[in-house]
């Protein structure tokens, strides 16, 4: 039986933007994936959530952003989990539910640098292949990967994709000061943000 190839793209998506979509699309083709599974975080242990949108809002925005892509899907696994969202627990659940799958995890180079400090990092590193997404402001991806590989048994490749400075932090700041986010997020996401008056307060 041919194993399906699925990459998980986790994040707070607070809000989701075109940088996330470009990353997912490039990973899909570079690694010949069957699917990219978007995984909005519930209560991430490594990154405190900025205020402005509820779990339900962040989930809804991801679903709107990927609605027209037949090989993108959204999981509610972490959003619906009570307590902290640990990556290793998510992976164990997915592996159990879909055993005939080669799992990948798309990770930004900034998060990769901290991977050795993640919960049960050594076992986590072994559970899947890692796709490292470069970032303009996060250092050389190859050097970071080399440093992490010296500490963890990791199989990883670097994603060949445009490096954008666009971030959810920037978008929240734009909204708070009344600026435009047109062309930075999908139109449906912008409409949702405006309709629900998200991110207006700092």
From Swiss-Prot:
CDD domains: NMNAT. Its EC number is 2.7.7.18. Catalyzes the reversible adenylation of nicotinate mononucleotide (NaMN) to nicotinic acid adenine dinucleotide (NaAD). One of its GO terms (biological process) is NAD biosynthetic process. Pfam families: CTP_transf_like. It comes from the Bacteria. PANTHER family: NICOTINATE-NUCLEOTIDE ADENYLYLTRANSFERASE-RELATED (PTHR39321), PHOSPHOPANTETHEINE ADENYLYLTRANSFERASE (PTHR39321:SF3). This is Probable nicotinate-nucleotide adenylyltransferase. Gene3D superfamilies: HUPs. Belongs to the NadD family. It catalyses: nicotinate beta-D-ribonucleotide + ATP + H(+) = deamido-NAD(+) + diphosphate. Keywords: ATP-binding, NAD, Nucleotide-binding, Nucleotidyltransferase, Pyridine nucleotide biosynthesis, Transferase. InterPro entries: Cyt_trans-like, NadD/NMNAT, Rossmann-like_a/b/a_fold. Pathway: Cofactor biosynthesis; NAD(+) biosynthesis; deamido-NAD(+) from nicotinate D-ribonucleotide: step 1/1. The keyword Nucleotidyltransferase applies. It comes from Synechococcus sp. (strain JA-2-3B'a(2-13)). The keyword Zinc does not apply. One of its GO terms (molecular function) is ATP binding.
